[in-house]
Regions:
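Phosphate/pyrophosphate-binding catalytic cores of soluble transferases and nucleic-acid-acting enzymes
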Residues: 1-309
């Protein structure tokens, strides 16, 4: 049997965890978590990390293993997953990867472009310029030095705009010149160097919009009742870390600063989480290789996977 990676994906709060555990038990597989925030050990409540009981049902990887001081990226995740799967496939024919971090899933399935290491002086300079001159100034600069990437980049995402300029000022070459990987409209990767030594089956989970939004609101209430504000208070000294630039913590930091009332923060968390869920679905729906199911269709999902093994 050809080694197969089953990727369970979908928006936040859709119900990935329970289905993933059921599939892991059925296929006798560990779980490769794919959440760029759950990988940090001090962010359990705000990221809805797996509970101790859930962790006992299957061996988990990439959960709570990093400190907030550790830098992590989709490129590092890709390499670590490939290294881990090479070992796990020696004893497992099927592995389950589950999560909603779009760039991380894409990195594992399709590979990631080989971006040069950024010069720290360049990074520091551009970070300062962003604060002093604002995003619009840097966007205008990117348009001049790399018009191709300017047309493509999310112009509201300061991190991505700055990163493109970091690459340009580090190498003297436009960021777009390093982006060699292309994808077809049907989602199939055409870069031969990125073909994986295992099959990939993508299972997308979706619910009706109002059902999903209701689950998101309920999850936020549960987080608050479980001590999200207290967790955020403990993380306040580290609030400048990139890992904490995350829905849930950002809003609670405003409460702790005295800027917002708790009720306002809770409503903002719900709203921002709903926005993020819509962004996830927009991203995933572009990939026509994903087979979509309601999370309660477990038997249909199992049959679909078995038919492709």
């Amino acid at each position: 049997m050809t080694p197969t990676l089953v990727v369970i994906l979908g928006p936040t709060a859709v119900g990935k965890t329970e289905l993933t555990l059921s599939l892991a038990e059925h296929f006798n597989s560990p779980v490769l978590n794919c959440d760029s925030r759950q990988i940090y050990r001090d962010m359990k409540i705000g990221t809805a990390s797996p509970t101790p009981e859930q962790l006992c049902r299957a061996r988990h990887y990439f959960v709570g293993q990093l400190s907030l001081d550790d830098y992590y990226s989709a490129a590092r995740y890709e390499q670590e997953v490939l290294s881990l799967t090479a070992e796990l496939f020696k004893t497992h024919s099927t592995l389950i990867l589950s999560g909603g971090s779009m760039m991380y899933i894409d990195a594992v399935c399709n590979g990631i472009d080989d971006i040069p290491t950024i010069d720290e002086e360049v990074r520091t300079t551009l970070s300062a310029r962003l604060k002093e001159e604002g995003l619009d100034t840097l966007l205008a600069e990117l348009r001049l030095v790399d018009p191709e990437h300017y047309d493509y980049v999310d112009k509201k995402n300061a991190k991505r705009v700055v990163h493109a300029l970091e690459v340009y000022y580090t190498t003297g070459k436009p960021y777009s010149s390093f982006l060699t990987r292309k994808t077809l409209r049907n989602g199939e990767n055409i870069s031969q160097s990125n073909i994986r030594p295992f099959n990939i089956i993508k299972i997308g989970l979706e619910r009706p919009r109002e059902e999903l939004f209701s689950r998101i609101n309920a999850r936020v209430d549960q987080m608050v009742n479980s001590g999200l504000l207290h967790e955020a208070m403990n993380l306040m000294p580290h609030r400048d870390k990139n890992a904490l630039n995350t829905v849930g913590y950002k809003e609670m930091f405003n409460v702790l600063d005295g800027t917002w009332e708790l009720a306002m923060a809770i409503e903002r968390i719900k709203k921002n989480t709903r926005v993020y869920a819509k962004k996830q679905m927009t991203w995933f729906k572009h990939d026509q290789s994903i087979a979509w199911f309601h999370p309660q269709e477990k038997e249909s999902i199992i049959e679909h996977i078995k038919a492709l093994l």
